[in-house]
């Protein structure tokens, strides 16, 4: 029985009880589905304006996600969202409407899909371009189980730039596993519609007529005599030439679109047809980022990821903050651009890494290569070989995606590529997939790699200066998101000298060793211990590779307890480096304790609350140290 009027309260009550969204939505009329989309957008705006999050992409994907849940049962068909920052509507339709107010909060809902949060989230997501590979694997598993279910993928046009997508499409075009891939094109970066002809093609391609023509031609081809086969094949190929999806067609996939990603009736009809085809189908849907929120519709990039804001004006509710490390890095790097050998690259994060203004001012020397971290690194290796000074500005979590290239293309030849690692350490609300905690461990093992870290904005300027001067091997320096823990001006900033640490405070017995942002944490502990009558020393390690062996040999002779602080993992991290040094030097009369992060993935939430949960806030640290000594 069709629902006469959209009773949102009753509908939401049903899905809160985990009743089937699939069955409930099937009773809605197109008008009611549009009303539901409006309600979902209002809820997203309500929460994101309070908590922050990804806004414009998720507003644009609402209609498509409603269509997915109406045509496919998410309980039996794996819904796989690439990155999944656009999947808020999916969360709201799968029993999380009330809990949505906890989005990105410590202990609350993740800003991305996570099976630990809900069985409706098929797979963890956060990094781009993994969805089609996951879908291929899921389709294989379903086939092995004898299931008629199929994966349903949503992937954005930005994610289509990464090589992993085409590795998956290569196999998919050969094996023909049944699945539906929705290409959510919200930037018009793949194919822009052109007038009436484009509209006409879109209408043709979203009906069964086009597919019937293609299927009929293929059947006829098998029955034609050899003399006519050539002409028939050419006729079939000519059909591809009038579609925007030639690339996908040539890979052996069926392409539908482009369609209007906000026309709910068209979306449902297209998805239903794709479902019936029982083969890999790509639906190219064009959507508007920020759909339903007029202020966001006009400023796409600004509204991609946002902090709390006033819905009525769009104004940020964040209080003024000191200059971010990202901004300091950008300004510092620009000061060296009188040297025409200085160049830079980022992978789809120009504003996030501070290279956006440099790309605008110096387009011949700074590049955004899209979501292609591996290509970014390898291309800079060649530039370094030609005598230039490349700076690779990249988030810690995304540099992981280019690890082979760092070793094979940069490391083996010892090329002087500078890795500027933004968002190092605990990044807060983006959670497990984005915490920048691995870089020290995975870079420290690479022969001849130099690793160093600033403690505040002033020393970050010195770090950029050192990277500019250093030309003997690859090097990397890391800095946090938002701000350093250490307040500006506490210590005078000196030049970085290869492999030299800096003693900030001399005391006795207890040595607090900080690295990078860990210096700020160590300094807070230092202040607390001083008030309780202790006299610790405070050392800024500055370089974790190479270590200042002369300084370490000196201080290890005069201290009995070494406390190590760094925003990184213990395994392979700073304490590991110091323990290796102690083993090599046969130092036995010193105890060392790491206050890094142990063997666990760190969840999302406010950074201070995360640190408290990990026992890394000052009261916990001081208590542990006092108990230890």
From Swiss-Prot:
Top EC class for this record: transferase
Residues engaged in binding thiamine diphosphate: 85, 126-128, 158-159, 186, 293, 373
InterPro entries per UniProt: Dxylulose-5-P_synthase, THDP-binding, Transketo_C/PFOR_II, Transketolase-like_Pyr-bd, Transketolase_BS, Transketolase_C, Transketolase_CS
Pathways involved: Metabolic intermediate biosynthesis; 1-deoxy-D-xylulose 5-phosphate biosynthesis; 1-deoxy-D-xylulose 5-phosphate from D-glyceraldehyde 3-phosphate and pyruvate: step 1/1
Reaction catalyzed: D-glyceraldehyde 3-phosphate + pyruvate + H(+) = 1-deoxy-D-xylulose 5-phosphate + CO2
Free-text comment on the cofactor: Binds 1 Mg(2+) ion per subunit.
Annotated Gene Ontology cellular component terms: cytosol
One Pfam family matching this protein: DXP_synthase_N
Entry-linked SMART domains: Transket_pyr
E.C. no: 2.2.1.7
Cofactor(s), names only, from the UniProt record: Mg(2+); thiamine diphosphate
Record GO biological process: 1-deoxy-D-xylulose 5-phosphate biosynthetic process; isopentenyl diphosphate biosynthetic process, methylerythritol 4-phosphate pathway; terpenoid biosynthetic process; thiamine biosynthetic process
GO-annotated molecular function: 1-deoxy-D-xylulose-5-phosphate synthase activity; magnesium ion binding; thiamine pyrophosphate binding
Subunit structure: Homodimer.
Function of the protein: Catalyzes the acyloin condensation reaction between C atoms 2 and 3 of pyruvate and glyceraldehyde 3-phosphate to yield 1-deoxy-D-xylulose-5-phosphate (DXP).
PANTHER family, alphabetized: 1-D-DEOXYXYLULOSE 5-PHOSPHATE SYNTHASE-RELATED, 1-DEOXY-D-XYLULOSE-5-PHOSPHATE SYNTHASE, CHLOROPLASTIC
Homology family: Belongs to the transketolase family. DXPS subfamily.
Name of protein: 1-deoxy-D-xylulose-5-phosphate synthase
Upper classification of the organism: Bacteria, Pseudomonadati, Campylobacterota, Epsilonproteobacteria, Campylobacterales
Gene: dxs
């Amino acid at each position: 029985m069709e629902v006469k009027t959209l009773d949102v309260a009753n509908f939401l009550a049903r899905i809160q009880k985990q009743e089937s969204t699939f069955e409930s939505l099937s009773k809605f009329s197109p008008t009611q589905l549009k009303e539901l989309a409006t309600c979902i957008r209002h809820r997203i705006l309500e929460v994101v304006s309070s908590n922050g999050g990804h806004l414009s992409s998720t507003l644009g994907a609402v209609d498509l996600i409603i269509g997915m849940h109406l045509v496919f049962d998410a309980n039996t068909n794996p819904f796989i969202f690439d990155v999944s920052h656009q999947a808020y509507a999916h969360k709201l339709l799968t029993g999380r409407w009330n809990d949505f107010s906890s989005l990105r909060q410590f202990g609350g809902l993740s800003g991305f899909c996570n099976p630990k949060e809900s069985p409706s989230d098929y797979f963890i997501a956060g990094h781009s371009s993994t969805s089609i590979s996951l879908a291929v694997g899921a389709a294989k598993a379903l086939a092995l189980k004898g299931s008629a279910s199929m994966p349903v993928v949503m992937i954005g046009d930005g994610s289509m730039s990464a090589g992993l997508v085409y590795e998956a499409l290569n196999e998919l075009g050969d094996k023909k596993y049944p699945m539906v891939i929705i290409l959510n094109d919200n930037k018009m970066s793949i194919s822009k519609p052109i007038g009436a002809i484009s509209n006409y093609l879109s209408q043709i391609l979203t009906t069964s007529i086009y597919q019937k023509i293609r299927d009929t031609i293929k059947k006829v081809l098998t029955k034609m005599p050899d003399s006519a086969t050539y002409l028939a094949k050419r006729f079939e190929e000519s059909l591809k030439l009038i579609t925007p999806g030639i690339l996908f067609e040539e890979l052996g996939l069926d392409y539908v679109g482009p369609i209007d990603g906000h026309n709910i009736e068209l979306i449902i009809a297209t998805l239903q047809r794709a479902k019936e085809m029982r083969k890999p189908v790509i639906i190219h849907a064009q959507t508007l980022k920020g759909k339903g929120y007029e202020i966001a519709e006009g400023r796409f990039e600004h509204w991609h990821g946002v902090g709390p804001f006033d819905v009525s004006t769009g104004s940020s509710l964040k209080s003024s903050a000191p200059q971010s490390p990202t901004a300091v890095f950008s300004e510092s790097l620009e000061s060296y651009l009188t040297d025409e050998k200085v160049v830079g690259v980022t992978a789809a994060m120009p504003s996030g890494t501070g290279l956006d203004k440099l790309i605008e001012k110096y387009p011949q020397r700074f590049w955004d290569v899209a979501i292609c971290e591996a290509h970014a690194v390898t291309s800079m290796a060649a530039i370094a070989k030609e005598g230039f000074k490349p700076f690779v500005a990249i988030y810690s979590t995304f540099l992981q995606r280019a690890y082979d290239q760092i070793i094979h293309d940069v490391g083996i030849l010892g090329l002087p590529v500078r890795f500027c690692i933004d968002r190092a350490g605990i990044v807060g609300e983006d959670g497990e997939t984005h915490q920048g905690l691995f870089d020290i461990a995975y870079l420290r093992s690479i022969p001849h790699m130099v690793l160093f870290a600033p403690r505040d904005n002033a020393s970050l300027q010195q770090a950029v200066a050192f990277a500019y001067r250093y030309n003997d091997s690859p090097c990397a320096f890391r800095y946090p998101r938002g701000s350093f823990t250490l307040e500006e001006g506490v210590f005078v900033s000196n030049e970085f000298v290869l492999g030299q640490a800096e003693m900030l405070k001399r005391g006795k017995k207890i040595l607090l060793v900080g690295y990078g942002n860990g210096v700020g944490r160590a300094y807070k502990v230092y202040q607390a211990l001083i008030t309780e009558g202790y006299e610790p020393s405070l050392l800024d390690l500055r370089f974790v590779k190479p270590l200042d062996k002369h300084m370490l040999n000196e201080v290890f002779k005069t201290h009995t307890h070494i406390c190590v602080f760094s925003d990184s993992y213990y395994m392979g991290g700073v304490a590991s480096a110091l323990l290796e040094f102690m083993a090599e030097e046969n130092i036995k009369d010193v105890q060392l304790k790491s206050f890094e992060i142990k063997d666990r993935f760190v969840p999302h939430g406010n950074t201070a609350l995360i640190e408290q949960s990990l026992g890394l806030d000052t009261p916990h640290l001081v208590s542990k140290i006092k108990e230890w000594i």
